[in-house]
Amino acid sequence: MYRSACDCDLYGSISDQTFLGYAKEIEKKFGVVWKDVVTRTTGLTITQSGLPITAYFFSSSGGKTELAINAWGSGRTYTQIVDDPGSLDLTLNPRFVSWSRDVPQSVIAAAFILPDVVSLEILGTNESGTVAQIQATSSSGVQVVLRGETFRSRTKIPSAWFSLVSVQN
């Protein structure tokens, strides 16, 4: 949706990693750096074979970037896994270097479209370390497998870079 107030197509939500505009520009710690980067890149377009790319953004990677196929389900030749040490720096990334979430059983069951979940199992991880697939089993024995990113999105956890600590019913 185009917004004339900011001359942008951004949303102030997780879908665009929260567009901050002027609030970011006047921030004392990083505002000057942010404004400089925006100014230096104004008018630039990232292309591949002469066509604009979809440029993905994320705030924290868990130490490595992700391939588009793993994050969004479709491949892009220009996305590669690279080390991202800044995501593991407690000073730069205090909220997501390490995180813990309690997700209610009802939310997990809804994520898998099951009436209940009695067990969860991570079936595999991607090269970046994110969960590739996770399986839930209901009390009636029905098993459903989701992509790690689908599970992350449906349960509203911060990342597909997670491990299971315990399951409580």
Task: Describe each PLM feature range.
Residues 1-169:
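Conserved, single-site charged/polar hotspot
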